[in-house]
Amino acid sequence: MHITQLNRECLLHLFSFLDKDSRKNLARTCPQLQDVFEDPALWPLLHFRSLTELKKDNFLLSPALRSLSICWHSSRVQVCSIEDWLKSALQRNICSRHESLVNDFLLQVCDRCPNLASVTLSGCGHVTDDCLARLLRCCPRLRALHLENCARVTNRTLTAVAAHGRALQTLHVDFCRNVSAAGLRRLRAACPRLTLRAEHSAAMIPDQLPRGPHAPGAALRKLLLR
């Protein structure tokens, strides 16, 4: 029996065992399999292990998406986490190649995936409060938001959770240095039923703008403490 003789349900089941690249390669072999690849039912979950994967065309964003994770574990994450005013020209150049990738991708998610229930972002040093606030507004069924080592996340994201995260049951903001203890207290008071975890976040040194002639020395001490 040829694979194209299988019914739609069997083909979807077969595709479900393949990774994104394998699904795309198989879909290229004939229009029938391409049609299966483009079936939203095949894509309830997406996991990305690097930012470059976000630029590929080997997946589908649709209202069927329920779970999304972007986990970037790379030495370049440390560069992204450095405050902009402390970065060298080389470091700024490195960041310029990918700094908008996650935000741009999440904006697409906001437009196409209103039924999203779970989001995990790890090592996404350029994701912004504004982007996360929009995600909360556009995905009203979001129940779990896990943020780890996202340097630009601040108390504004906590405020957005209180305002727009009506369905949110779990929030993790681990190793997010610009989230403060005061911001966490306000969120706990506003959302007492929310399961909130903030491992090390409030204890880390937050971003500071350079002040006065001694700023470079302070900046060096801060880098050494990280």
Curated annotation (Swiss-Prot):
One of its GO terms (biological process) is protein ubiquitination. GO terms for cellular component: SCF ubiquitin ligase complex; Z disc. It is found in: Cytoplasm, Myofibril, Sarcomere, Z line. Its main location: cytoplasm. Directly interacts with SKP1 and CUL1. PANTHER family: MITOCHONDRIAL ATP SYNTHASE COUPLING FACTOR B. Substrate-recognition component of the SCF (SKP1-CUL1-F-box protein)-type E3 ubiquitin ligase complex. Promotes ubiquitination of sarcomeric proteins alpha-actinin-2 (ACTN2) and filamin-C (FLNC). This is F-box and leucine-rich protein 22. The gene is FBXL22.
